[in-house]
Amino acid sequence: MQAATVVINRRALRHNLQRLRELAPASKMVAVVKANAYGHGLLETARTLPDADAFGVARLEEALRLRAGGITKPVLLLEGFFDARDLPTISAQHFHTAVHNEEQLAALEEASLDEPVTVWMKLDTGMHRLGVRPEQAEAFYHRLTQCKNVRQPVNIVSHFARADEPKCGATEKQLAIFNTFCEGKPGQRSIAASGGILLWPQSHFDWVRPGIILYGVSPLEDRSTGADFGCQPVMSLTSSLIAVREHKVGEPVGYGGTWISERDTRLGVVAMGYGDGYPRAAPSGTPVLVNGREVPIVGRVAMDMICVDLGPQAQDKAGDPVILWGEGLPVERIAEMTKVSAYELIARLTSRVAMKYVD
């Protein structure tokens, strides 16, 4: 009998990279594998994508794991370095790094390195999180061009705040700021992540940085799924029934008795709960697949179990397979039901969930 298991489909992952190349044919791909590749496994994901042009991570530790695992492609530190003492390692490992503040720039100017570092100057075009403000950007850029520890030319990167809202006007403003600053500068350019790739072809430039869409999940909050853009779900969260019980009309289920059956039915108990990372907020009616058939969760999600209404005539039995999201049940639907973003759902599964990779 199978307990909570994440099944990662390598074929779907490779398909998605190819599909994104079709959407941005003139751009190189930074496959973003931060946060354990959005819950898909850092090394296994990188090894599945030998055709990616580079990999993007959030922490130096993630980059070092890639190198230790045999990944030789360029690795971009999307948030830059947090400590000047890391610069010799970044140089020796040929990592690319974002540079987004005065402290990082000063550290580069003062460092003693054997080789210069490939730098992506981060321009704050409107996210207002990391990056150099436009009014300070020319002076900052000039210092980078004069720094002996920076490999020339300097590349330029930014990030959209509302790429998933095509009618709000914010992305056009960010693009205008980015284009104005980049004009006449020789370095590579990148501003498009998943939403930019899908909705803003004018933003693709030299490099794009697919994150969640690489894993077959839509970044948009418009009820779309990855399949609407030709991508396939890479992750399936699976488990099995551990019990099937007769349940009488009028009987409650689970903590607090929040769901009461309106008919005689058969109740399935699934080995899955918030201890595995499944959202405790999932309301009654949230769908799961049992033997490929959609049935609703009933009652509260517990730490280790959820209950589902199999129906009065159900023939399901203990040990039968359950899919919580993935193939046949997009995680975007679960996100909509639970009000928990798909990003969080796929990235927050706990260590007791087994990982299985298939082709």
UniProtKB/Swiss-Prot annotation:
Q: Which domain of life is it from?
A: Bacteria
Q: Which Gene3D superfamilies match?
A: Alanine racemase, Lyase, Ornithine Decarboxylase, Chain A, domain 1
Pfam families in UniProt: Ala_racemase_C, Ala_racemase_N
- What pathway does this protein act in? Amino-acid biosynthesis; D-alanine biosynthesis; D-alanine from L-alanine: step 1/1
Q: What biological-process GO terms show up in the record?
A: D-alanine biosynthetic process
**What's any one GO cellular component for it?**
cytosol
Q: Which residues carry this modification: N6-(pyridoxal phosphate)lysine?
A: 34
Q: Which UniProt keywords apply?
A: Isomerase, Pyridoxal phosphate
- Cofactor list: pyridoxal 5'-phosphate
PROSITE patterns (alphabetical):
ALANINE_RACEMASE
Matching entries from CDD domains are given as:
PLPDE_III_AR_proteobact
Residues bound to substrate are 129, 303
* E.C. number: 5.1.1.1
Q: Name one GO molecular function term.
A: alanine racemase activity
Q: Which reaction does it catalyse?
A: L-alanine = D-alanine
Active-site annotation: 34 (proton acceptor), 255 (proton acceptor)
Task: Report the function annotation for this chain.
Answer: Catalyzes the interconversion of L-alanine and D-alanine. May also act on other amino acids.
* Membership in a protein family: Belongs to the alanine racemase family.
Protein name per the record: Alanine racemase
User: What gene name does this entry carry?
Assistant: alr
